[in-house]
Swiss-Prot record:
Family designation: Belongs to the ROK (NagC/XylR) family.
Catalytic activity: 2-epi-5-epi-valiolone + ATP = 2-epi-5-epi-valiolone 7-phosphate + ADP + H(+)
Keyword Transferase: yes
Keywords recorded for this protein, A-Z: Kinase, Transferase
Name of the molecule in the record: 2-epi-5-epi-valiolone 7-kinase
TM region positions: none
Superkingdom: Bacteria
Keyword Ion transport listed: no
């Protein structure tokens, strides 16, 4: 029997830099994707968290048709049983204060059936659909962008385990050490703490590491590819990418330094769980610097791999790790999948499995 077509879902993806929204259905896919700057801390650093949260709710509420179903992918550390957002340094600054996002959306637009999931969770839901028939036991999606986080799913059960706080994979706030010429580089994370993975390996973190290295060795950096391009008017990201394309040694050393914490995390993950058949890297940093990004990560793992395994099976580690195209793990599609799965009540609750919040 042919299944009836689904009505389109309004989907939104709230990142630290951009807010995207569109209409989506399993039958028709994504419609036209609209983009606007996120109403967040990066754009309005002087605004309080409550004001930024209220602005976000107004923005989302204005994008949904009356009586519609909406799926929201949110770049925040969330309790996935309740939908409460604990914190998002890129969106709301270093403040950590619980914010009941579904309740705020329902209050603003009670006619809409809202489903809210973390943005990495949303991307992983889409990725899981894309690789479900590829024999993958467990898949981990790692996003490297304005922030850094990951999620892991067991595709055999569909479960995304969470801890007692409803969290999983907030790796951007794990401690990390970055070395340049053997000397530690200490930078501060957007959450306010020094020495986190995101403090050096996120988009803003890479810029901070570059600034520290330029102060340490101004003569070398003055004539480097990134500096000369920025002096000619390019932004840091474009200048860094172009310098990597040209084989600039300063840019290459910077990339080596800032990918080391990511490689350390992935090495540990595969040591602890060999059933991770796919670790997919995504996000603006990974996509913007590819193919240099995956090459740098793989180089770390070839030089310092897994004890014995990397000697006996040299490709086992690197063969599981790759940068995937944006269309393979799109949080907009994942938000739509979550909205359809939620139905009138959440599809998952309790039992250590992540909730798809629609209450």
């Amino acid at each position: 029997m042919k299944r009836p077509p689904h009505h389109p879902v309004t989907v939104a993806d709230v990142g630290g830099t951009h807010l995207r929204w569109a209409r989506w259905s399993p039958d028709g896919g994504l419609g036209e994707v609209h983009t606007t700057p996120s109403p967040g801390h990066a754009r309005r650093p002087g605004a309080g968290a409550a004001d930024l949260q209220a602005e976000l709710i107004r923005e989302l509420a204005s994008r949904v048709e009356p009586g519609a179903r909406a799926g929201v992918s949110l770049g925040a550390a969330m309790d996935h049983h309740s939908g409460t957002a604990y914190a998002s340094a890129p969106l709301w600054g270093p403040q950590v204060s619980p914010f009941d996002v579904p309740a705020a959306l329902r209050a603003a637009r009670p006619d809409v059936h809202w489903t809210v999931v973390n943005d990495v969770t949303a991307g992983l839901l889409h990725l899981a659909e894309m690789v479900r028939d590829a024999g993958v036991r467990k898949a981990c999606l790692v996003t490297i962008s304005t922030g850094i986080a990951c999620r892991t799913m067991d595709l055999r059960t569909g479960g995304i385990p969470v801890d007692a706080a409803g969290l999983q994979g907030e790796i951007g706030h794990l401690p990390a050490t970055v070395l340049a010429d053997g000397v530690p580089v200490v930078t501060r994370c957007d959450c306010g703490e020094p020495g986190h993975v995101a403090a050096s390996s996120s988009g803003p973190g890479i810029r901070r590491v570059a600034a520290v290295l330029a102060r340490r060795d101004p003569a070398t950096w003055a004539g480097s590819g990134p500096t000369t391009r920025m002096m000619a008017g390019s932004g840091f990201e474009d200048a860094f990418r172009a310098a990597l394309d040209d084989g600039d040694p300063v840019a290459a050393d910077l990339l080596t330094a800032v990918t080391a914490p990511i490689a350390d995390l992935l090495r540990t993950a595969l040591c602890l769980d060999p059933e991770l058949d796919l670790i997919a890297l995504t996000g603006g940093v990974a996509h913007g610097l590819e193919p240099h990004y995956s090459a740098a990560v793989h180089d770390h793992l070839r030089r310092r791999g897994l004890y014995l395994t990397s000697e006996r099976e040299p490709d086992w580690l690197t063969g599981r790790i790759r940068v995937v195209p944006p269309a393979t793990a799109d949080p907009l599609v994942g938000a739509g999948l979550a909205a359809l799965a939620a139905g009138p009540v959440p599809a998952y609750s309790g039992g250590g499995r992540e909730a798809l919040v629609g209450r």
